[in-house]
From Swiss-Prot:
Family per similarity comment: Belongs to the COMM domain-containing protein 8 family.
GO cellular component: cytosol; nucleoplasm
PANTHER family, per the entry: COMM DOMAIN-CONTAINING PROTEIN 4-8 FAMILY MEMBER (PTHR16231), COMM DOMAIN-CONTAINING PROTEIN 8 (PTHR16231:SF0)
Physiological role: Scaffold protein in the commander complex that is essential for endosomal recycling of transmembrane cargos; the commander complex is composed of the CCC subcomplex and the retriever subcomplex. May modulate activity of cullin-RING E3 ubiquitin ligase (CRL) complexes. May down-regulate activation of NF-kappa-B.
InterPro entries (UniProt xref): COMM, COMMD4/6/7/8, COMMD8, COMMD8_HN
UniProt keyword terms in alphabetical order: Cytoplasm, Nucleus, Transcription, Transcription regulation, Ubl conjugation pathway
Domain COMM residue range list: 116-183
Disulfide bonds: none
Gene name, Swiss-Prot/TrEMBL: Commd8
PROSITE patterns: COMM
Location (main, coarse): cytoplasm
Descriptive protein name: COMM domain-containing protein 8
Record localization: Cytoplasm; Nucleus
Length: 183
């Protein structure tokens, strides 16, 4: 059965089965902070455009499987278009390198921002001024944040309406869920 374009890792079918595990480990090394494999070692299998897709596909696949904490059965469902040799190579790499991939994913999240919230304070104010005769009674939140970045604490002050505050809370809750899933 020939794999369909668009299924995860379908480009691996071009690779001889005995080279599969080696390539997968080298690509995992690459996104874990070491050197990626060189195209020149695989130029007889893929052209340079295909090679870029292979690197992206394998990286995306392993990050998704580990990030979403797929079971072996769920992973096999993703690989059902690959031949058994390639499926086995992917599963062996995944089993042996799962923790390392997870650490790389956590590192990416931490690298998004090295800034950390040190302290915060908030005040609720009621805006009573208006350019019309009727008064404007709109609650405003003043949020003071002390953010530590590169061993320096920088103060930030933000004024938000009720809607903006709700949006901030929703974003923080979503970020917290992602962090908890990765633990």
């Amino acid at each position: 059965m020939e794999p369909e374009e668009g299924t995860p890792l379908w480009r691996l079918q071009k690779l001889p089965p005995e080279q599969g595990a080696g390539l997968l480990h080298k690509i995992i090394d690459g996104f874990c902070g070491r050197a990626y494999p060189a195209h020149q070692d695989y130029h007889s299998v893929w052209n340079s455009a295909e090679w870029k897709h292979v690197l992206e596909d394998v990286t995306t696949f392993f990050k998704a499987v580990v990030g979403k904490n797929f079971s072996e059965e769920e992973t096999l469902q993703q690989l059902n278009q690959l031949n058994s040799c390639h499926q086995e190579a992917v599963l062996k790499c995944l089993k042996s390198r799962r923790n390392e991939i997870k650490q790389a994913l956590l590192g990416e999240i931490v690298d998004i921002s090295c800034a950390q919230l040190q302290d915060f304070d908030w005040q609720l104010k009621l805006a009573l001024s208006s350019d019309k005769i009727a008064t404007l009674q709109m609650p405003l939140l003043n949020l003071h944040l002390d953010v530590k970045e590169d061993d320096k604490v920088k103060p930030y002050t933000v004024e938000m309406s009720k809607e903006e505050l709700q949006s901030l809370i929703s974003s923080l809750e979503a970020a917290n869920k992602v962090v908890l899933q990765l633990k």
